């Protein structure tokens, strides 16, 4: 490969702490030597978010809307301690939440699999991609303690002034208890369905939606009906052309099936199920350091990719003291590769598509050849048994990836 690949417009968002350092190394060693990008950079480091009253996060989200591709470094979501540490004006909200609220869409998490990294669920040879509907249900519910005997009712008051409808939830006869009212909106469920179908088409894998519609006949039944209607009208022929399928499953059946499967499917989960299952699936694959997170918008055009982990504060503290660190950059690299792969799809850019695939292959091949960071060595040998010779430090590993990428691209006839 003699000339740089023209890559088009990408919005990149810098982050915090150890991941911020790794982010710059990724650009310097793995991306910019080979790809000429129209980079639109936004500094989402905590100090800059504070200085701009978090306007920079909103600006970044609007830029992603405009250019359709965003890649994001991990960022600090401040708690009381962080407010004190950085002398912040206020406890700013999660940038991921802010971006998601502006763009809409669904977050899909996917494990990066290497043959030599052991998995807790040994049968999972392909990723299981979990899409969580991050709106409504328990997370926007009104719950309360019922202090004593009495009735709990739910009332719907139509906006047009027509007759109210009241439903009895429960008559408390002997003492009190607890009660809850929760909701979701058709528009949000429709967007969730479109994002899920788009993800399945882009991966070429089947899609399953899990609910408990046998118990929540109206509530979960609505999810089931909306997905089915959209699938039949807009996606069925595309799925059949790719020889993939969509099915609804009961959540308990789905959990059991997932455990027995080899992976290789998209799993659309309601909010609470997605919260729980995404963590259990991540652990089943062995490491959060090997987990990508992609936000897919319902338009199928707009995508934002990032690592599914945090800013690796502990390593950053060591780095600040001049101590050696061995921080895993793989999920952050895959944020770039997934973003660039999407840019390539939008622009029909075969060279960029080849580069994104080569970058991911180099990461996996390097680890499978025995060159890795300490966390992965610990997955293989167990942390107490890891010796210094078993792993590379942060910078050595990045250099190794750079060297292997250079060699791989040198062989390519682009």
Curated annotation (Swiss-Prot):
It is found in: Cytoplasm, Cytosol. It comes from the Eukaryota. Its cofactor is Mg(2+); Mn(2+). The modification Phosphoserine is found at residue 389. Mn(2+) binds at residues 252, 275, 279. It is an enzyme of class 1 (oxidoreductase). GO terms for cellular component: cytosol; mitochondrion; peroxisomal matrix. Acetylation at Lys-374 dramatically reduces catalytic activity. Substrate binds at residues 77, 94-100, 109, 132, 212. InterPro entries: IsoCit/isopropylmalate_DH_CS, Isocitrate_DH_NADP, IsoPropMal-DH-like_dom. The modification N6-succinyllysine is found at residues 126, 400. Its EC number is 1.1.1.42. Its main location: cytoplasm. Binds 1 Mg(2+) or Mn(2+) ion per subunit. Catalyzes the NADP(+)-dependent oxidative decarboxylation of isocitrate (D-threo-isocitrate) to 2-ketoglutarate (2-oxoglutarate), which is required by other enzymes such as the phytanoyl-CoA dioxygenase. Plays a critical role in the generation of NADPH, an important cofactor in many biosynthesis pathways. May act as a corneal epithelial crystallin and may be involved in maintaining corneal epithelial transparency. Belongs to the isocitrate and isopropylmalate dehydrogenases family. This is Isocitrate dehydrogenase [NADP] cytoplasmic. It comes from Microtus ochrogaster.
